[in-house]
């Protein structure tokens, strides 16, 4: 049962959730699995794998978020933005992607699941000019750290941070971080049932 697995995984990462939040997370997996058959939103085909590779892989970041206003760049079907929005109703999330089918899916998820703290925008990140800047700029499986910082440099507020979700951290990629940016924290993340390296880099503009 997916619900029992979700309960166990949330307990493992010590993340409390209401019954409504758990239902929304499971319903999101259900919608992702259903839409994926027609729209090819993710290469992960199995709901149990989606729970680990998409939901839990997103939620391990939740305790590290600082601020109220976030943007998830290159969000795809809404990852990590939708799971994080479900678990953080006090924060708002802009989900940015350049593919219309992904944006349509996100909007349907928000409508069906009653998620009121996300807004989905179809745009390339370089072209997106927000009226209000963000406390946090999230990136998961979007681009190299160098490209993320180059393309998203205009998005954080004065004291905002970049949150780069990465797998393996290569010395080469770290050395290519552009001038004017500083890694303030590197956090090793533990995702339940995922025997792969996961890291969160917090980065600020100097």
Curated annotation (Swiss-Prot):
* Family that this chain belongs to: Belongs to the methyltransferase superfamily. RNA methyltransferase RsmG family.
Question: Sorted alphabetically, which keywords does the UniProt record give?
Answer: Cytoplasm, Methyltransferase, rRNA processing, S-adenosyl-L-methionine, Transferase
Q: Its function? A: Specifically methylates the N7 position of guanine in position 527 of 16S rRNA.
Q: Which domain of life is it from?
A: Bacteria
Query: Which molecular function term from Gene Ontology is one that the record holds?
Result: rRNA (guanine-N7-)-methyltransferase activity
Record's InterPro entries? rRNA_ssu_MeTfrase_G (IPR003682), SAM-dependent_MTases_sf (IPR029063)
Which GO CC annotations does the UniProt entry carry? cytosol
EC class (word): transferase
- Where along the chain is S-adenosyl-L-methionine bound? 74, 79, 125-126, 140
Gene3D superfamilies from the UniProt entry:
Vaccinia Virus protein VP39
Q: Principal place where this protein is found?
A: cytoplasm
Q: Which HAMAP family match?
A: 16SrRNA_methyltr_G
Q: Where in the cell is it found?
A: Cytoplasm
Q: What reaction does this catalyse?
A: guanosine(527) in 16S rRNA + S-adenosyl-L-methionine = N(7)-methylguanosine(527) in 16S rRNA + S-adenosyl-L-homocysteine
Is Thylakoid one of the keywords UniProt gives this record?
no
- Please provide an example of a Pfam family that matches this protein in its UniProt record: GidB
Per the UniProt entry, the Enzyme Commission number(s) are 2.1.1.170
Protein name as annotated: Ribosomal RNA small subunit methyltransferase G
């Amino acid at each position: 049962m997916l619900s029992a697995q979700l309960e166990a995984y949330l307990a493992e990462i010590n993340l409390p959730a209401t019954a409504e939040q758990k239902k929304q997370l499971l319903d999101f997996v259900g919608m992702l699995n259903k839409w994926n058959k027609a729209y090819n939103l993710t290469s992960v085909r199995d709901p149990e794998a989606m729970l680990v590779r998409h939901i839990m892989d997103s939620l391990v970041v939740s305790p590290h978020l600082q601020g109220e206003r976030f943007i998830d760049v290159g969000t795809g079907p809404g990852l990590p933005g939708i799971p994080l929005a479900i678990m953080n109703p006090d924060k708002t999330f802009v989900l940015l992607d350049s593919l219309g089918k992904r944006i349509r899916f996100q909007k349907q998820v928000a409508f069906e699941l009653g998620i009121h703290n996300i807004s989905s925008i179809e745009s390339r990140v370089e072209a997106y000019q927000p009226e209000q800047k963000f406390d946090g700029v999230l990136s998961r499986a979007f681009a190299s750290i160098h490209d993320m910082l180059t393309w998203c440099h205009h998005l954080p507020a004065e004291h905002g941070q970049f949150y780069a979700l990465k797998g393996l951290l290569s010395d080469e990629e770290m050395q290519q971080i552009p001038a004017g940016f500083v890694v303030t924290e590197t956090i090793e993340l533990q995702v339940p049932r995922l025997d792969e390296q996961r890291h969160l880099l917090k980065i600020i503009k100097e």
